[in-house]
From Swiss-Prot:
It is a peripheral membrane protein. NDH-1 shuttles electrons from NADH, via FMN and iron-sulfur (Fe-S) centers, to quinones in the respiratory chain. The immediate electron acceptor for the enzyme in this species is believed to be ubiquinone. Couples the redox reaction to proton translocation (for every two electrons transferred, four hydrogen ions are translocated across the cytoplasmic membrane), and thus conserves the redox energy in a proton gradient. This is NADH-quinone oxidoreductase subunit D. NDH-1 is composed of 14 different subunits. Subunits NuoB, C, D, E, F, and G constitute the peripheral sector of the complex. GO terms for molecular function: NAD binding; NADH:ubiquinone reductase (non-electrogenic) activity; quinone binding.
Length: 389
C-alpha cells in the first residue's frame, strides 16, 4: 500500500510557552520521518550588541538569553572577563555565587518539570512546581530587586551583599523542598500514563549524544558522566560534595530522573555553601575594574568621579582570548571572549546549550508518533531566548 508524506507545521508557539519555536514535521501517517527546526523569531543580536558596549554595560544583556536561569548567564560572562583580567574574587562573593547559581538551577528545573508534566497532561505537578518556584523568585527579588532579569553578579564580585533575612529564607527552602520533590515523584514516577509516554521515547545513545554536542541533563540522561562543576570546576565547586546522576536507557524517562536527582543535589550544595559563608568583602581589590562603595560615591568627589569614569568609559582589558563554560541547568553555557586591549569586547561568542541540544531533535524523535514529539521537546528543556539570542 502506497504511503503519502504529509508536512505539518508546529508553531511558532507563544513566547510564554516553550518559546517561538517552529518545527516542520514530515509524517507518514502519524510516524515522524523528518523534523526541521526553524529558529530566529526571537533574535535580538545580543552578541553584536555586547561588542558595542563596555564590559559592565554588556552584562545585563546576558540576562535576556536563558531568562529562566539569568544568574548562570551572568556567571559565565563575569568569569570570562575575570579570566581575561586575571583577578580573583573574594571567598564570600564566590560562595554567594554558588548559592545563587544552585537556587537558579532549582528554579529552572521547577519550570521544566511543571511544563514537561503539563505537556503530557499532568496539571497537578504544574501547580505545585510553580508554587515552589515562587519562593525562589522572592529570594531573587530580595537579593537583586528583580524577579527574573537579576543583573546581580559583577565583574570582580557582586552588586551588593546579602540582605537581612536571606539565611532564614534559604533555610526554609532547604527544609521543605526535599519533601516537595518526593511529592513530584509520587505523582509521576510510577504513574502509568507518565511511564507510557516517557519510557523508550526520545532515545539517543551516548555516542550520538556526544557527536551532536549535547550537554547537561540531556547528555547525562544518555549515560555520559560529565558535569562541568566537577570535571572543569569554577567558582570553587571543587570544594563541594555532590554526585552527578546519569541515566542507563537514554530515553525521556532517564532525563526526567536525572533532573530530579539534580534538584536534590542542588539542595545539598546550597546547604554546604550556607555553612561555608563567612563575613568578608564582596568585591575584588581591583579599583580600576570594580565600582566604589556607595558611601564613597555619595560622600566624596573622588568616589563620584571614580564611579562616573567606570560607568561611562569602562575599563581596559588586556589583549587576549578566553573560553569559559558553566554548567547551566540546560547544559554547557560557554562564552568565547576576545579582547583587543580596549574597554569593549572585540568579539563575544556564546555557546548556548539549548541551541546545540535542539539540533538532535530529529535523531531523538524520528520513527516516533507525532504525539510523542511534545514529550521530546519537553525533555530537552529548551529556551528560545537563548537559542535565538
Amino acid at each position: 500500500m502506497a504511503s503519502e508524506i504529509m508536512t505539518l507545521n508546529m508553531g511558532p508557539q507563544h513566547p510564554s510557552t516553550h518559546g517561538v519555536l517552529r518545527l516542520v514535521v514530515e509524517l507518514d501517517g502519524e510516524v515522524i520521518q523528518k523534523i526541521t527546526p526553524h529558529i530566529g523569531y526571537l533574535h535580538r543580536g545580543i552578541e553584536k550588541l555586547s561588542e558595542h558596549r563596555t564590559y559592565h554595560q554588556a552584562l545585563p544583556l546576558t540576562d535576556r538569553m536563558d531568562y529562566l536561569a539569568p544568574m548562570h548567564n551572568n556567571l559565565g560572562y563575569v568569569l570570562a572577563v575575570e579570566k581575561l583580567l586575571g583577578i580573583e574574587v573574594p571567598e564570600r562573593a564566590e560562595t554567594i555565587r554558588v548559592i545563587m547559581a544552585e537556587l537558579t538551577r532549582l528554579k529552572s528545573h521547577l519550570v521544566w518539570i511543571a511544563c514537561h508534566a503539563l505537556d503530557i497532561g499532568a496539571m497537578t505537578v504544574f501547580i505545585y512546581a510553580f508554587r515552589e518556584r515562587e519562593k525562589i523568585m522572592e529570594l531573587y527579588e530580595m537579593v537583586s530587586g528583580a524577579r527574573m532579569t537579576s543583573n546581580y553578579f559583577r565583574v570582580g564580585g557582586l552588586s551588593r551583599d546579602l540582605p537581612a533575612g536571606f539565611e532564614s529564607a534559604v533555610q526554609e527552602i532547604l527544609d521543605t523542598f526535599p519533601g516537595h520533590f518526593d511529592t513530584y515523584e509520587g505523582l509521576l514516577t510510577k504513574n502509568t500514563i507518565w511511564l507510557q509516554r516517557t519510557i523508550g521515547n526520545g532515545v539517543i545513545s551516548a555516542d550520538d549524544a556526544i557527536d551532536f554536542g549535547i550537554s547537561g541533563p540531556a547528555l547525562r540522561g544518555s549515560g555520559v558522566d560529565f558535569d562541568l562543576r566537577r570535571d572543569l570546576p569554577y567558582s570553587g565547586y571543587e570544594k563541594y560534595d555532590f554526585k552527578v546522576p546519569v541515566g542507563e536507557n537514554c530515553d525521556t524517562f532517564d532525563r526526567y530522573k536525572v533532573r530530579l536527582v539534580e534538584m536534590r543535589e542542588a539542595v545539598k550544595i546550597i546547604d554546604q555553601a550556607m555553612k561555608r559563608l563567612k563575613p568578608g568583602p564582596i568585591l575584588a581589590d581591583a579599583p580600576q575594574v570594580c565600582y566604589p562603595p556607595k558611601e564613597s560615591v555619595y560622600n566624596s568627589i573622588e568616589g563620584l568621579i571614580h564611579h562616573f569614569k567606570i560607568a561611562s568609559e569602562g575599563f581596559p582589558v588586556p589583549e587576549g582570548e578566553v573560553y569559559q563554560g558553566v554548567e547551566n541547568p540546560k547544559g554547557e553555557l560557554g562564552y568565547y571572549m576576545v579582547s583587543d586591549g580596549g574597554s569593549k569586547p572585540y568579539r563575544m561568542r556564546v555557546r548556548p546549550p539549548s541551541f546545540v541540544n535542539l539540533g538532535a531533535i530529529e535523531k531523538m524523535a524520528k520513527g516516533s508518533m507525532i504525539a510523542d514529539l511534545v514529550a521530546v521537546i519537553g525533555t530537552l528543556d529548551i529556551v528560545l531566548g537563548e537559542i535565538d539570542r
